[in-house]
Amino acid sequence: HWQTHTSVCYCLYGSKRHMLLSIFNDYSMPFYKFGDILFLQKIERKDWVAFISQRFADTGKQISDELSGMIADKMKNHPYYTQQLSQQTWLRTSKECSEAIVNEAFNSLIGQLSLLFTNIIDSLTSRQISFLIAVADGVVNFSSKDILKHYQLGTSANIKNLKKATLEKDLIDILPGNTIEIQDPAFEYWLK
């Protein structure tokens, strides 16, 4: 019973932004107005490079800053996936890491996740899938007739519903400037 705890501070965090906002901002939820909401920025590439390179060095293995950066870039600085890819790369490295090792680890990680991603896709409509593919392809102007036709999204009025549905499923984030981004970088790569 959290209500009875005294002199305690809690930090609840996660990458499912829509779900977290709902938990703390929805009147019907148990944590309504429970505390402050802070949006943290992603860890910067340069910090990942230093961290990954140092962790390899700490265990007697070598990885160049370029390859450490490649790991962070492939995972778009997403903390969970950057650490997963780093671990998979580290496990495959005996002494010195190569680009081939990073790529092998990346492909293996995507392969491990493919069943999960297939289950996600199976829960979506064909237009929701097409919308996600368009987002993964970097589309920003969804009202363009060419885009609507190419991705078979229906009418421009349908875009609002597609955004809402995929946002509620925590598949996308809508960033400042109304930029749409797929939350999961591994899922985004898999979609392509």
Report residues per predicted region:
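Conserved nucleotide-binding/hydrolysis micro-motifs of P-loop NTPases
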Residues: 15-19, 43-45, 89, 187
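Amphipathic alpha-helical "lid/sensor" segments that cap RecA-like P-loop NTPase cores
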Residues: 49, 53-116
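Helical mechanochemical/support elements of P-loop NTPase systems and associated helical scaffolds
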Residues: 16, 48, 81, 127, ...
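C-terminal leucine-rich, beta-strand-based interaction scaffolds used for sensing/assembly
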Residues: 115-192
